[in-house]
């Protein structure tokens, strides 16, 4: 099992981060690349974009079972828009894919499942994503089919692999959408079964930065951008609410948090818990 080592330099001098945009036409070739490097870059940071939430709770504080019921209702009814993946090695380096231009690469998958003219969504969420550059019309025309994405992801080494670790931020919905796509069915009816499928697909080394914030000496709060600012971590590429960019910012925030607050005992004891659901 690989141990995550401290990395003081989150963006080495001279390295340019490039987002690899994935559409239907290059889906298979990009998964071929990922499959070839996953053994050397087993740390996966993930973010998704989806059409907001259409079912909401009247209660400010609810237990994990109630929160899961709400999550399931939304995920079952809605469709994924983007998935961002950042792969890293044990020292925090991004894959260069043999490039000699001092570039590191991350991935952003664009899906065709969601049709803004047809499907349920939260209008404010859609407007926010439009402002951040998501082209819903192009997604419908050129985007990835979730069924083919699932087939390729299942055989890529990203899932059902005990050697990988996942790093996320407030990720119950993110994993919910991935589980829905990978299993090709609605989410399990109960939180306990959701936990079981999570372990099968993603293993036990799942780190949710939002959960880990509770155990930092310095008080951290808010969303990803606010936490990153507090940790003095800059966005290396792209904009907020772009899944590829957010996956990289999540990885950098995790690295900084680990180096500041988890030097003595490491972050491993906080693995396997999704914020709000107390998963695992």
From Swiss-Prot:
<feature type="binding site">
    <location>
        <position position="246"/>
    </location>
    <ligand>
        <name>a divalent metal cation</name>
    </ligand>
</feature>
<keyword id="KW-0805">Transcription regulation</keyword>
<keyword id="KW-0539">Nucleus</keyword>
<dbReference type="Pfam" id="PF04857">
    <property type="entry name" value="CAF1"/>
</dbReference>
<keyword id="KW-0540">Nuclease</keyword>
<dbReference type="GO" id="GO:0005737">
    <property type="term" value="C:cytoplasm"/>
</dbReference>
<feature type="binding site">
    <location>
        <position position="49"/>
    </location>
    <ligand>
        <name>a divalent metal cation</name>
    </ligand>
</feature>
<keyword id="KW-0378">Hydrolase</keyword>
<dbReference type="GO" id="GO:0030014">
    <property type="term" value="C:CCR4-NOT complex"/>
</dbReference>
<comment type="subunit">
    <text>Component of the CCR4-NOT complex, at least composed of CRR4 and CAF1 proteins.</text>
</comment>
<dbReference type="GO" id="GO:0008408">
    <property type="term" value="F:3'-5' exonuclease activity"/>
</dbReference>
<comment type="similarity">
    <text>Belongs to the CAF1 family.</text>
</comment>
<keyword id="KW-0804">Transcription</keyword>
<dbReference type="GO" id="GO:0004535">
    <property type="term" value="F:poly(A)-specific ribonuclease activity"/>
</dbReference>
<feature type="binding site">
    <location>
        <position position="174"/>
    </location>
    <ligand>
        <name>a divalent metal cation</name>
    </ligand>
</feature>
<dbReference type="GO" id="GO:0009611">
    <property type="term" value="P:response to wounding"/>
</dbReference>
<dbReference type="InterPro" id="IPR036397">
    <property type="entry name" value="RNaseH_sf"/>
</dbReference>
<dbReference type="GO" id="GO:0042742">
    <property type="term" value="P:defense response to bacterium"/>
</dbReference>
<dbReference type="InterPro" id="IPR006941">
    <property type="entry name" value="RNase_CAF1"/>
</dbReference>
<protein>
    <recommendedName>
        <fullName>Probable CCR4-associated factor 1 homolog 9</fullName>
        <ecNumber>3.1.13.4</ecNumber>
    </recommendedName>
</protein>
<dbReference type="GO" id="GO:0046872">
    <property type="term" value="F:metal ion binding"/>
</dbReference>
<keyword id="KW-0269">Exonuclease</keyword>
<dbReference type="InterPro" id="IPR039637">
    <property type="entry name" value="CNOT7/CNOT8/Pop2"/>
</dbReference>
<dbReference type="GO" id="GO:0005634">
    <property type="term" value="C:nucleus"/>
</dbReference>
<dbReference type="GO" id="GO:0000289">
    <property type="term" value="P:nuclear-transcribed mRNA poly(A) tail shortening"/>
</dbReference>
<keyword id="KW-0963">Cytoplasm</keyword>
<dbReference type="GO" id="GO:0002213">
    <property type="term" value="P:defense response to insect"/>
</dbReference>
<comment type="function">
    <text>Ubiquitous transcription factor required for a diverse set of processes. It is a component of the CCR4 complex involved in the control of gene expression.</text>
</comment>
<dbReference type="GO" id="GO:0003723">
    <property type="term" value="F:RNA binding"/>
</dbReference>
<dbReference type="InterPro" id="IPR012337">
    <property type="entry name" value="RNaseH-like_sf"/>
</dbReference>
<keyword id="KW-0694">RNA-binding</keyword>
<feature type="binding site">
    <location>
        <position position="47"/>
    </location>
    <ligand>
        <name>a divalent metal cation</name>
    </ligand>
</feature>
<keyword id="KW-0479">Metal-binding</keyword>
């Amino acid at each position: 099992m690989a141990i995550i080592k401290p990395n003081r330099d989150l963006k080495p001098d001279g390295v340019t981060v490039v987002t690899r945009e994935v559409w239907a036409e290059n889906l298979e070739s990009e998964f071929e690349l990922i499959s070839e490097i996953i053994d050397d870059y087993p740390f996966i940071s993930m973010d998704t974009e989806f059409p907001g939430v259409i079912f909401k709770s009247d209660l400010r504080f609810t237990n994990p079972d109630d929160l899961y019921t709400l999550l399931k209702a939304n995920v079952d009814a809605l469709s994924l828009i983007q998935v961002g993946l950042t792969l890293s090695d044990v020292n925090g380096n991004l894959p260069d894919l043999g490039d000699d231009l001092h570039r590191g690469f991350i991935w952003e998958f664009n899906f065709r499942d969601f049709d803004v003219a047809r499907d349920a969504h939260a209008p404010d969420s859609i407007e926010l994503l439009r402002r951040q550059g998501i082209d819903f019309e192009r997604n419908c025309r050129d985007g990835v089919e979730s069924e083919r994405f699932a087939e390729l992801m299942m055989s890529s080494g990203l899932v059902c692999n005990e050697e990988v670790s996942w790093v996320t931020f407030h990720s119950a919905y993110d994993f919910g959408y991935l589980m829905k796509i990978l299993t090709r069915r609605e989410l399990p009816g109960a939180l306990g079964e959701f936990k079981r499928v999570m372990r099968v697909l993603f293993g036990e080394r799942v780190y949710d930065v939002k959960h880990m914030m509770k155990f930092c000496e310095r008080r951290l709060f808010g969303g990803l951008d606010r936490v990153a600012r507090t940790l003095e971590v800059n966005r290396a590429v792209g904009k907020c609410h772009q899944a590829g960019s957010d996956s990289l910012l999540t990885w950098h925030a995790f690295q900084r948090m680990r180096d500041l607050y988890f030097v003595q005992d490491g972050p491993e004891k906080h693995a396997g818990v999704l914020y709000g659901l107390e998963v695992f």
